[in-house]
């Protein structure tokens, strides 16, 4: 073929040998592209920093070029996740504003609230023509039923905890109820802003402690490798923001709000209920103080805790992998801020290279919307940015 049609062969060879490298943008273009660096704003979200760390080029498309996505008629899984997220937040506000004790909240009142808030929420979030689709109606109905079970599970958690909600969708930022986290960028200062899904607080004599809960509708679990790499900054920086008012930083957790069917290999109702409750356990990091552990989860040291999920083989809860000393938790908080500054500086220098991360579990390309744009080919001269697995024992050496 190469001998018979040199012109076509040359064309194909150029495509195969093409250079897909992306060089840094000038600082002038960077500041014009990213609104965060304009003198009028000088603020940024944590999710933007995480996106940059996952892949600079994907971040450049999302936040620099900002392409519009085509709307679809079918309600997508991502939208259903947001719908469930909104329902749980509305439920949290409803409980916080109307019930001093959860014992006075009846199942009838919960169902009435659920019916009203979800009907209003569906009308607000989805256009009328999408709500009329039988397919969409089915998935919305299933989500509503699932939300009721989620709320019952969360109520049981609240009853087993002395920590009480003090905020839903709490804004930390220049105009928020909490101040922003300030990051130094050369001679400038960037305000890191965001919204914390939920903050719970408890008092211990003259002192108080806070925990933050981040609602997740996808499969998200605590991962030390990603925490240290800077891929997962939210939990640590949310906790830093929430504890700025002299409250002790006691824990940061994901709360999974899955709309997926529960797969079990047994039929007993009680076992199915226990399996469902396990999906709702707080997944994150907590300080190793027994009085705080007991305040978060009265059953923390039992075989089946009500609120907290623990990692590691050691029998003593205090020695579990994700139960950390004050020094370790402080180290992770400081490290998250350090990583945020690193990401910010690289972004400011105009880094837009195609360099997606890869761990032993996943990579940045799996759910990336912009794969067709970058044409990343890991089998050629291009390569993933490898994130090595780090076990919890390594944290001891880092802290010293």
Predicted regions and their residues:
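Structural signature of nuclease core domains in nucleic-acid processing machines
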Residues: 1-400
């Amino acid at each position: 073929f190469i001998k018979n049609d040199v012109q076509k062969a040359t064309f194909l060879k150029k495509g195969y040998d093409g250079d897909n490298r992306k060089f840094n943008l000038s600082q002038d273009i960077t500041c014009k592209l990213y609104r965060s660096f304009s003198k009028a704003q000088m603020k940024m979200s944590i999710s933007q920093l995480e996106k940059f760390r996952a892949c600079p080029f994907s971040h450049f498309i999302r936040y620099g070029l900002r392409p519009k996505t085509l709307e679809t008629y079918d309600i997508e899984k991502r939208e259903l996740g947001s719908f469930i997220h909104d329902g749980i937040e509305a439920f949290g506000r409803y409980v916080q504003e109307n019930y001093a004790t959860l014992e006075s909240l009846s199942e009838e009142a919960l169902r009435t609230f659920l019916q009203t808030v979800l009907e209003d929420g569906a009308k607000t979030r989805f256009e009328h023509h999408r709500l009329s689709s039988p397919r969409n109606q089915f998935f919305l109905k299933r989500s509503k039923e699932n939300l009721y079970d989620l709320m019952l599970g969360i109520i049981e958690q609240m009853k087993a905890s002395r920590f009480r909600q003090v905020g839903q969708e709490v804004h930390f930022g220049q105009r928020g109820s909490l101040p922003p986290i300030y990051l130094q960028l050369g001679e400038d200062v960037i305000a890191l802003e965001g919204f914390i899904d939920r903050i719970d607080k408890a008092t211990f004599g003259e002192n108080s402690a806070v925990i933050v809960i981040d609602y997740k509708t996808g499969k998200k679990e605590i991962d030390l490798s990603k925490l240290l790499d800077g891929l997962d900054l939210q939990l640590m920086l949310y906790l830093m923001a929430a504890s700025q008012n002299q409250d002790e930083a006691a824990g940061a957790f994901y709360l999974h709000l899955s709309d997926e069917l529960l797969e079990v290999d047994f039929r007993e109702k009680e076992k199915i209920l226990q399996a469902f409750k396990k999906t709702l356990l707080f997944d994150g990091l907590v300080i190793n103080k027994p009085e705080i552990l007991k305040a978060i989860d009265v059953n923390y040291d039992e075989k089946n805790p009500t609120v907290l999920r623990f990692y590691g083989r050691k029998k003593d809860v205090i020695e579990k992998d994700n139960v950390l000393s004050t020094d370790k938790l402080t180290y992770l908080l400081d490290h998250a801020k350090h990583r945020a500054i690193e990401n910010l500086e690289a972004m400011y220098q105009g880094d837009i290279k195609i360099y997606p991360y890869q761990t032993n579990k996943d990579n940045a390309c799996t759910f990336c919307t912009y794969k067709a744009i970058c044409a990343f080919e890991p089998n050629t001269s291009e390569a993933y940015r490898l994130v090595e697995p780090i076990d919890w024992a390594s944290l001891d050496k880092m802290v010293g």
